A protein has these predicted regions:
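Core catalytic region of metal-dependent phosphoesterases/phosphodiesterases
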Residues: 2, 6, 11-86
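Acidic, His/Gly-enriched loop-helix segments that form or flank divalent-metal centers
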Residues: 86-166
């Protein structure tokens, strides 16, 4: 099984399809790890998610834009007091509008995607002990003991690589 990573799709369905085609991605055999931000930016976020749902070995690492959409799906903005307004300013209005058809919210699609996004993880460690995360972590803490889950999708710490392990 090959493992391929993709990050920051931002609703660009055409680019997602092109990357999968050019890499000769096998939807049944290969693993795709999304490093987050499937949503916001382009208007085809729902189409991207529909395609990703067809991949047998798909890992969704949560990005900050995915977290915004997840909160929009649930209406839970407690941890983000200005979250919805901020999300709408940062590309969320495009995603929100993409879930509407003829001016009405497509509740069936929202429900389906809200269920699928529940599988998203804050980070992923594969069988070779490689860490996959959207943004970063605070290196003073263990990967699974971060002081805030926001570190995983908004952290800006510099990555460390141990070249002796490569």
């Amino acid at each position: 099984m090959r493992t391929l990573c993709i990050g920051d799709i931002h609703g660009n369905y055409k680019a997602l399809v092109e990357v999968l085609e050019r890499s000769k991605f096998d939807m049944k055999k290969d693993r795709l790890i999304s490093l987050g931000d499937i949503y916001d930016g382009h208007s085809k976020g729902p189409e991207c998610v529909d395609l990703l749902m067809k991949i047998k070995n798909f890992v969704w690492v949560l990005g900050n834009h995915d977290e915004y959409v997840r909160r929009w799906f649930t209406g839970d903005w407690k941890k983000f007091p200005d979250g919805e307004a901020r999300w709408l300013r940062k590309g969320g209005s495009i995603t929100r509008d993409a879930y509407h058809k003829n001016g009405k919210l497509n509740k069936k699609l929202v429900k389906k995607h809200a269920e699928f996004i529940k599988q998203a993880v804050l980070y992923f460690i594969d069988e070779k002990n490689r860490l996959y995360v959207h943004a970063g972590i605070d290196w003073k803490y263990a990967v699974d003991k971060q002081p805030s889950e926001k570190n995983y999708y908004t952290g800006r710490d510099t990555w460390r690589v141990d070249a002796t392990k490569l």
